[in-house]
Amino acid sequence: MVQENNNTQSKWTDSQRQVIDENYHHILVSAGAGAGKTAVLVQRIISKLIDPHDDLTVNGLLVVTFTEKAANEMRDRIARELKKALSQDPENDHLKKQLYLLNKANISTLHSFCLEILRHYFYYLDIDPAFSVASEYDVELLRQSVIDNYLEEEYGLGEQSFYLLVDSYGGDKNDEKLKKMILTLHRFSRSHPRPRKWLQSVKDHFEVSTDDDLTNTVYYLEIQKDIETLFKQCINYFKRALQTSEQPGGPYQYAETLLEEIEQVQNFTQQLVEVENHSFDWNSFAERVAGFKFSKLPSVSKNDDVDEDLKKDCKKLRDHGKKTFQKLVQNYFTRSKDELLRDLQQLSPLMNKLIDMVINMDDKYEEVKKQRGIMDFSDLEHYVYELLDQYPEIVSELHQRYDEVMVDEYQDINQVQNAILEKLTGQQSISPDLFMVGDVKQSIYRFRLAEPELFLNKYDTFDQRSEEGSLIELQENFRSSPMVLESVNYLFSRIMTGSLSGIEYNEKVKLIPASKPRELYLNEDDNEDDKYEGQAENENQVIDGRTEVHLLENKDTNSREEDTEREAQLIATTINSLVEEEYRIYDRDLDDYRKLDYSDFVILSRKTKEQAELVTNVFQEHGVPLYAELDTGYFAAQEVQVMLSLLKIIDNPRQDIPLAGVLRSPLVGLDSNELVEIRRSNPGTDYYEACKRVLTNSIEQQNQCSEKTIQKMQKFFSQLERWRRISRERSLAELIWDIYQITDYLDYVAGFPGGRERQANLWSFYDRALQFDSFSHSGLVKFLNFIEKLVEQDFDLGKARTVSENENVVRLMSIHKSKGLEFPVVFVMGLGNNFNFNDQKGDLLLHKDLGLGPKLVDLTNRIKYPTIAHQAIKGSLGRETLAEEMRILYVAMTRAEEKLFLVGSGKDIESKISVPEEPAAAQNYLDWIYPQLGEDSELFHKIWNDIPGQQDGKSVEYNWKSYFESLLSQTFTWEVDQEEFEDQKRTLEQAISYSYPYNIATEIVGKMSVTDLAKSDTYIDSKIVSQNQSLSSVQDHYKKLAATQIPMFLETTEDAGDNKYESYKEHHTPSKRPEFLKSNSGLTGAEAGTSIHLAFQHLPINSDLNSQEFSEEQISNQLDDLVNKEIITQAQRDVISEDLIMKFFQSELGQAILERPKGLKRELPFTLGVPAWEMLAGSEECQAELEAENIETTELQGLSDETVVIQGVIDYLFWDGTNYYLIDFKTDKLNTSNMDEIEKRLQGKYRMQIQMYLRAITEIFNITPTKAYLYHVPTGNWIQVE
């Protein structure tokens, strides 16, 4: 995975040069995917800064990016180019000044810019200058608290309009639906520059009379657009049916009927235009449309020589058209104009009350925020807009400060952000120029209220240096191969139309390959569908560059989970084959072909949250390393679920499901049989009561369950009572910390797969509790209610991240997260999953222009039905959803560099290919892809895959579960030979009584970490214990230690045990002290060392940071980013010195790494088998012990069949283009500053460890490092290990 490849060529294309040189007041650059827009934007800045005729300085620029990461990368690129220019003109004082000013330049997100403006001009508004910006989690906490308190007040007032609103929209059991409605409308209103003005204007939409003309309502134009769209769909279906009837062998008898139906629907469409002539009568039009009846098709006899398949296709197309027409009638033409307007009248008081409540709630929300001295992100933009709107002197100052405002990713801004930019760059002669770059085809943040229409409005009005502004197109694509681009262009030229997406995908915007031609040797047999199933014909086989569409037929089930599993099976099998058979792929950086790695693959999905666990399980079965990059899944994590269940029963233990879950969890450890014992012993009661009775009866010597079960229960319920008491007396965070301490749950989860992530999730859970405690009205009950609301609202915190982007794993990520990235091979899965139209299903729909679209609730008959407002907004949202999904598919397909796989499951696939849906009627991505898969399609390689569960190229359902259950149900018996049994018994007895001749070797564990070897000089010699001393006695003494750690603490003296165990606890128990239990905030030495290792492991070293640009400030920003990503904690961040890291990268080898970041491999894990006798013979102290025990060294060689398994992780392995270098970081605190002494100590301590590293690299990776170094971080000393 790499960042978007921005063209760094010295020779720019004509269009790129135009972008760099264009001087105009307003410029819009429409940059297609992979067009190198970032490089062009940087070059435009550099050209202006180094131009002696341009007075622009870097602090005269305002550069707005979408993310802080993009801002940092932009700043780094500008710094590199400035230094490059300065190296050519070292005496240029102007360039020196620009480089100095760069760190203070306004290159940031719009939020950061707004924050700076408010810090500077706070005194104009009633703002606390010491305000802080609250996290999204804190904001949600506060909003929930405010709405709860506000609704209590409303209930107390008892207004009729309020109770009518609650009865209509509050829900059956409580008022949660109304709460959600108010909060949703409040958040939605904040996307407008003047939220309250917009809310008040919405009230006017319902001020109508039955005497009014329907066409004068705000909703009519949207209704007209929706009706026209559906009419056109009908006509297209009928026309396609007509074309089918006219084919040779087609049902020509249907042609006349189809022509009549086409003509009638076209007449209906034309009549809609009459509204412009003021002669449109809704009621009469509705009657005509609703009264239209379709004729019966003429019969076709067997003697008419009609192809049966064409006849079926023709009927299917006509049926599609008829269903679309019937849907249209049902939606719009079953009620009169007066009834439609009367609905709006009825809704007026309810909507007025709802809007008033949103405004009142906002008042209270603002008041609480001011009391706390906090703002949310929305406040930053609204306050700045208020400043610019009300205080022209501020605008004038900013006009004088900035010469040009540059906006990256302009397609993703919202209305408030655009309003701010317009204030900053007005049409006055003194206002700064506005430069905007983006790609509306990649606008995929509608859920964040982004407005692609803002881009489209300028795109439609700007021209080559028109009065409104200048438009420049960047079509050249420097990322993808011509084959990938051909498939993208082919598909979107057929589905992306102005009416459906707002932009026409034509010659003006299609992607043009910019990569240079390269030699490619295709396989001899190019048409084998199973080319990845068998052995490659030669080891230099190059991956086929055609886009492949893999279709999985699903006949018997609607299970999305099963579809996902089968698609994952296909993808995992394909990836394994491509990697194991050593297919090659072109690498731009090498300008040559190389073998595929797992890290070359990404799987993109629209619904990653739902699919991650299923895909991960399948990949584990196939042995393919996979990392699912999610911002979700936190609340579903098993360890978090256990903690939530425990908190629920601490609040109220009479909850059967949470209680059973905790009892079954590792916190208690009952198995399913024990749970059944408890229930059987006390049926008819709640589970808590059943447990209490079991415990009571055990005291009275009437045991109903086993003694083992009772002991577990007694221990847990004693703890439970204690925790219930703590919950009433102490804070939530203290309660959770006590649970962690008593149960050792943090340590327990570390032993499972993904242990680091599980621990991080539990730490995050504790941190959330700390945050919650900081709010008023906190407590266990409110915390649980709050979490429940977050889950209901699909608000997820995201699992902690513990995998870096440098690891050789396949990535699974959402399409949204992949934006701006590129990958050699891309799989887009789940293409048969239906689009999410949930925003069109609620009782109240919201739209930026149309306002509110409520359903009308008939309280008397307890029914609800859609209004004209609801239907208008539903139609508009439906079109916007399809446009967004089309752009999302475009983003997914344009991530691929060399190879694109499209994978989807569906029913009746062949039928849908022959009779596809209209693009505007698509329900999923496959509906857009099916029409492109006809027999004449050469750009898409269509494949039905032979994977488990499929036969003869077509899908069949295979019930794996039933198969395994049938095996388990079988009874297997063996006849036992008594004589043979006695022989085996004697053999076993001999084995048990056997005395191992090399007992000294048992003191070396069978599996150990390489870091243990650092202690080998004080380790192996102390393992030569007396033959009379049993290992079991030592194990008993250290029974809490893992077997692999026992040798580290064995000593030759009898009284060393206790001290050694305490030493182990100090150095190996993670520091888990929360702030309220700490005497200070420091970490132990071991923890500090781990923190520094994590920093070197995860710092993003990429091609944008060379030796000149790597600064302490950048390191500081990157460390802060690791905290934000929860890779390191703030406490760990505090002990990491930027200076220490800088010292490493300023060294000769550190500089080489920055110059060639792709040559660096970090955190390489390995497992190595080493003969046990080598481990013993390698120590001088061991030799002395052998002599003392009269044991010959040759005796050790008898252990050659015994193997010690060594596990380790190599910190850095670096290839500079010629040689490999092994680097291992050490943070030992030594009580000397003498460099020779430091070198001697570290070499002696770690020599064996480094030798194992070198051996592993040579044997496993087939690489021989030229040199191996220890790097002592505290002193910056490089120590070569021979």
From Swiss-Prot:
Keywords: ATP-binding, DNA damage, DNA repair, DNA-binding, Exonuclease, Helicase, Hydrolase, Isomerase, Nuclease, Nucleotide-binding
Annotated UvrD-like helicase C-terminal domain residues: 516-820
EC number: 3.1.-.-, 5.6.2.4
Domain of life: Bacteria
Cofactor (UniProt): Mg(2+)
GO-annotated molecular function: 3'-5' DNA helicase activity; 3'-5' exonuclease activity; ATP binding; ATP hydrolysis activity; double-stranded DNA binding
GO cellular-component term (any): cytosol
GO BP terms, alphabetized: double-strand break repair via homologous recombination
Signal sequence range: none
InterPro entries, A to Z: AddA (IPR014152), DNA_helicase_UvrD-like_C (IPR014017), DNA_helicase_UvrD/REP (IPR000212), P-loop_NTPase (IPR027417), PDDEXK-like_dom_sf (IPR011604), PDDEXK_AddAB-type (IPR038726), Restrct_endonuc-II-like (IPR011335), UvrD-like_ATP-bd (IPR014016)
Record carries keyword Cell cycle: no
A Pfam family of this chain: UvrD_C
Catalysed reactions, semicolon-separated: Couples ATP hydrolysis with the unwinding of duplex DNA by translocating in the 3'-5' direction; ATP + H2O = ADP + phosphate + H(+)
CDD domains cross-referenced by the UniProt entry: DEXQc_UvrD, SF1_C_UvrD
Residue ranges constituting the UvrD-like helicase ATP-binding domain according to the UniProt record: 10-481
Self-association and partners: Heterodimer of AddA and AddB/RexB.
Primary role: The heterodimer acts as both an ATP-dependent DNA helicase and an ATP-dependent, dual-direction single-stranded exonuclease. Recognizes the chi site generating a DNA molecule suitable for the initiation of homologous recombination. The AddA nuclease domain is required for chi fragment generation; this subunit has the helicase and 3' -> 5' nuclease activities.
Family the UniProt entry places it in: Belongs to the helicase family. AddA subfamily.
UniProt-recorded name of the protein: ATP-dependent helicase/nuclease subunit A
Organism of derivation: Natranaerobius thermophilus (strain ATCC BAA-1301 / DSM 18059 / JW/NM-WN-LF)
Organism lineage: Bacteria, Bacillati, Bacillota, Clostridia, Natranaerobiales
Record gene name: addA
